[in-house]
Amino acid sequence: MTPPAPALLGTSVTQTTPPAIEVRDLVRRFGEFTAVDHLSFAVRPGEVFGFLGPNGAGKSTTIKMLCTLLQPTDGAAFVNGFDVTRDPARVRESIGIIFQDYSLDDRITAEENLRFHSMIYHIPRDERAERIAQMLAMVNLSDRAKDKVRTFSGGMKRRLEIARGLLHYPAILFLDEPTVGLDPQTRQTIWSHIHELRKRVGITVFMTTHYMDEAENCDRIGIMDHARLIALDTPAALKADMGGDVIRLRTADNAATVALLAREFGVTAREEADMLRFEVEHADTFVPRFLRHAHIDVQAVEITPPTLNDVFLRLTGHAIRDEGADSNDRLRAIMRRRGGRA
């Protein structure tokens, strides 16, 4: 009998609506290096759920465990009700996967790539042609069906991979950094296709990203840093928890301004390049009051509502950027010492 789940961060899934994905105290270690540290969460059916965090935070490792490509060191995970450790074949049959790196065969056509995939997933022979045509139309590639993939742009290849990932009608689509390296316009096009697919077929989407605009497309996001899940909620709720506006100042003496803000206003500011950054409630009244009392040459003032980057900064103390090199280098060094490859 499956034991009852512990309290799951940020979920209201009930016994009458079983989760599409359920993760309980999931851990993955590589020797002494912990890549995923006791994650617990649930994803609702039909939800677009995202993991936001810098490279090296543990996002891709988590997806690999959920897709049965890595064995958990400890804990449990269930995808479409199947245990990823005990029922890996059933998990794989019910999911589609799109990873960061392209995995298409660019020597053959778009149609041939999809036909090969249809054979792997045992799609009935008499359904293959119709299914392939349907998916190519869904991602606006019908007119390129007979063209070799090597002639495609990066955005077209990504759309073809989405078509391939959906060809066998999976219940869940996993997207690991689906638009990395693509320009903003192409990224937006890809997201339009993803949302259209969800409306048409009710698919659950689980994705990882370090792009703020992509995270805004999610119904809920989990924020990861240093192998841990540190927050989980809707983008709007996470930003609302900031409790105010974000102010950035550039002054003639930033050090003196930091001291003044702390002494006179009880505000803690931090330096970002040549600007000072802090949060206050009611910035529209705070800024005039500050300028009246500052007696410091203020060169620039910027007031913005909080962003997800501000949320991440508040939770972790650093901005979301490519901070994964050190973690990845440590992991590779550990695997080399063990005679493996990271």
Descriptions of predicted regions:
Residues 115, 119, 126-144:
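Conserved ABC ATPase "signature" region
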Residues 169:
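Conserved catalytic motifs of ABC-family nucleotide-binding domains
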Residues 173-176:
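Catalytic Walker B motif of ABC-type/P-loop ATPase nucleotide-binding domains
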Residues 188-201:
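Helical segment within the ABC ATPase nucleotide-binding domain
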Residues 232-233:
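ABC ATPase "signature
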Residues 244-319:
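Short, charged/small-residue-rich alpha-helical element at the C-terminal edge
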